Every structure is written in structure tokens, then in C-alpha cells.
């Protein structure tokens, strides 16, 4: 049996796409280009305690506060940049500062090679600064989660894709895990 050696995954194989549709009719997930930083932090919430009959403290993760720190060079005519800049410059609040982002792992393809694993989440754009430096107009801030993460896939498997179409479900071709639980529950009820 042939053993395949592990391969290092390049950062460029995890690509983010933002919904730039302003009409609300049909999502248009466009590639988030020209970002100089896009670092995801999970920010786990811990519950730590020490019981009187034990010598060691215990810790559990009880929640998360995911945030993605970003920085980009502003390009006029880039719909993603214009959407984020409008939130910064207009000091938008509440739902007006929310964006949907699909993150695609182009290195995670199904066995047929026609789908890539993706996640979707709604974030609040939290502006930090703009105008830093003299070479380009730079915007920076963070995207903080306002929804649960949803797993799905995209059928665009080319790393150079400028847009993607996201579908909720299992990229390996099976039933989505939440749908599976519902089916199993219904199966038991019907027995």
C-alpha cells in the first residue's frame, strides 16, 4: 500500500468571497482581493474552575467570539473594497454594517473534484482606521461574527475564480449534518 506524504497547505488556498449584492435579490459572492492581512482569531470563551477535591484547575471552552482582522489597499471599482469603505466612511451601524462572507478551502475537494469545502457566516464590519501610510489608501479593522458558521460547498474549483456560488450541504456529496439529524429523528418517530 502506497503512503502519501503530507503536503503543506499554502495560505493562498483559503480564499474569502463577500456578498456584494446591494438589492437583496440574489447573493453575489466576489473574491476579496488586495488584502494585505486577513487573520482569523477564534477568541474562545473559557469556563475555568478548581474543585476542592482536586489539585488541578479544569477549563472548558463554552463559546467563541470569532473575529477576522483585515487590512487592504483601496482600489476604486472593487465592489468588496467599496462596500467596506462605505461602512467605514459612512460610520454605518447595526444591520447596515453587516456583510456575508464565504470562505473557500480550495485544497479540500470532494472525491470527484467538482466541489470545494466552504463556510458562510455573517459578520459586523468593525472599522479601525483608514488613510494610514502615504503609498496607498489603506483601510483596516475587523470582521466580528454575528451568526453561527454554516458549512457547505462551492462548485467553482479553480483557484482563480472571481466569484463563487455557495450551497449549504456536505461537499463530499452526502446529506448535510443538520439534515441528517432531522431525518434520523423522523425515522425514530415513525417506528
Each predicted region: which residue ranges?
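Solvent-exposed edge beta-strands and adjacent loop segments
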Residues: 1-71, 75, 122-135
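Generic N-terminal leader/processing signal
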Residues: 5, 106-107, 179
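Intrinsically disordered, low-complexity segments enriched in small/polar residues
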Residues: 8, 22, 39, 88, ...
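Short beta-strand and beta-hairpin "edge-sheet" elements
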Residues: 36-40, 104-151
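Extracellular/virion structural assembly segments
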Residues: 54-120, 148-156
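Short, low-complexity, polar/charged sequence segments that are solvent-exposed and flexible
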Residues: 87-93, 122-125, 143-144, 161-165
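Intrinsically disordered, low-complexity terminal/linker regions enriched in Pro/Ser/Gly
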Residues: 154-191
